[in-house]
Amino acid sequence: FQVHQPNRLRQYRFFDIGKTSHYYDDFTTRTILRRIAKKCYLPMNELLLEQIKANNGAFKVAFSITGTALEQFDRYCPEVLDSFRALAQTGCVEFLSETYYHSLASLASEPEFKHQVLKHKAAIEHYFGQTPVTFRNTELVYSDDIADMVDSLGFKTILTEGAKHILGWQSPNFVYKTTAKHAQKLLLRNSGLSDDIAFRFSDRNWENWPLTTDKYLSWLKAGDGEIVNLFMDYETFGEHQAASSGIFDFMKYLPSAII
């Protein structure tokens, strides 16, 4: 799951120049964060914790949480941070590393990119007591040059997009290797199955609506490889897909059905 919250900018007028250098709209940032926490982060974290316990640790998930999101949780909604810590303590949750600010520094500056990744790595260690071994770049952007930079930082695995125009006839449901010195494992997101939940779940015009646990499980079993990597915005649950759509019930029964 991806978790990100930007620092929102306030309206800054021409006549503010020279009078104030506070560019951020803290009130809006706090208001939006607390709304999403109530609708998504808190109930979904509770659901995942219940499923981890119910399945005796056989159910595992991974989070990629930006540094700006962690800062906002700490400042405006510490109960969300506590709920992520509770998940971390189960030993069934992995925290991935990424750029601290959800930036595209990997495309512009190697020193800045490495600085942000190491800053984010330190934040994960501070908040959750984990040292990340898997890296995912902003928007899953990937290239051989990025793999080399990530390799030099010691990461063992990279998560990226299973882009059809790159894969061609190949499947995203296998573990690949990078061209970097230490040939990290390369995990590819299954865009179709991920987007079925993230974007199409509540679309009544979709030919496969409604999406049930049994139907989705049959698609997973029909996979043509070793693994299926699902990766989506965490706000899918309760924010993008409303609770009334049944998204929480879907996720409640999916782990045990798969396991």
Question: Which residue ranges define each predicted feature?
Answer:
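Catalytic alpha-helical scaffold of carbohydrate-active enzymes acting on polysaccharides/glycoconjugates
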Residues: 1-134, 140-196, 202, 206-225, ...
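Periplasmic/ER-lumenal interhelical loops and adjacent helix-loop junctions
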Residues: 235-238
